[in-house]
Amino acid sequence: MDRRHVLLGLAGMTLTSAALAQSGVSPAGSGGSAAMGQAEQQWMQQTMMVGSVAMKSSELAIQKADDDNVKQFAKFEADEQKGLAEVLRSMVEGAATTQPQPDQKHAAMMEKLEQAKGKAFDRAYVQGQTEGHQELLQIQETFIKSGSKNREATNVAKLAASRIREHIEVLQDILG
């Protein structure tokens, strides 16, 4: 594994998170953007649910991971997911969005991680992140193809999709 490649990819994740957090995305319906319809709400809920699992599993990995690259990825991922969740919540009028609870599949993955230790934990975390990122990418691509008139939501999905592709590459490098 090329450690510099992994570290450069992780540094890029931080820049994207900062850009999202400072993007000044205006609430739905303002700034000339279309209101949040059913497609936008579904995209947001799905993104927040899978992102929440990525964040929680990464917070666990910060504590439990043995491999330094896994631990560093987890730190960047947790921070990025927090930033993305803030941006998504800011897009809803009144910001009354609650964090969705994980479904059974994601809850089972979290339980497996909580019980794993050492290299088995590292491998399970990276595999779980890879699967989660593939799921997040599918959510973003489906939304982008939907032709939403909400410019902010579409732009966030496009930016997220780009970063998710990079994360998948970094995760594959970590797996070796």
What role is predicted for each listed range?
Residues 2-9, 13-15, 22-176:
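His/Met- and acidic-residue-enriched segments that coordinate or traffic transition-metal cofactors
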